[in-house]
Amino acid sequence: MNNNDLLYEVALGKDSELIIITYAIKYSNCDFIHAVQVKPFIRSNYTKIFESKKLNNFVDIGYYDNPIIKTYGFTKKKELAELYKEKYEKLIKFAYYDNLISDKIETIDYYKTKEFELKKEIATINAKINSFN
């Protein structure tokens, strides 16, 4: 890939054993492609976090065992790609908090509050995303 193809690539938030990877690729017929995968972060395999390859107008960022969330989308608007990026950053935190709650940790009320706040923020982002349609 040359510099014109790769617009951005970000590995975000290693909260405990979770990681989110977001990136956008520029193609001649589609300005932005946004791909996200959230998965358990396998420390023993950290040197090969993901593989990428172009498939027509799509980006395949590989597959992992038991992904928590796996979704792909594409847009010609950078603002929309950024909204999706923000949404999935929040979803990874939500999954992390939900995991802690299911483990019945002592600070369960704190994490339930955090989950509630994230749900509201995600709903706001979804409304912005829907306004593009």
Model-derived features with residue positions:
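Extended alpha-helical coiled-coil "stalk/arm" regions
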Residues: 101-126
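Intrinsically disordered, low-complexity, charged/polar segments
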Residues: 39-105, 110
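Short intrinsically disordered terminal tails
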Residues: 1-3, 127-133
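Short, solvent-exposed secondary-structure boundary/capping segments
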Residues: 30-38
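Short coil-to-beta transition motif at edge beta-strands of beta-rich domains
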Residues: 1-19
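Short, solvent-exposed coil/turn segments at beta-strand boundaries
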Residues: 1-3, 26-31
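Short beta-strand-centered aromatic/proline hotspots
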Residues: 17-29
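Amphipathic alpha-helical interface segments
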Residues: 10-15, 25, 60-61
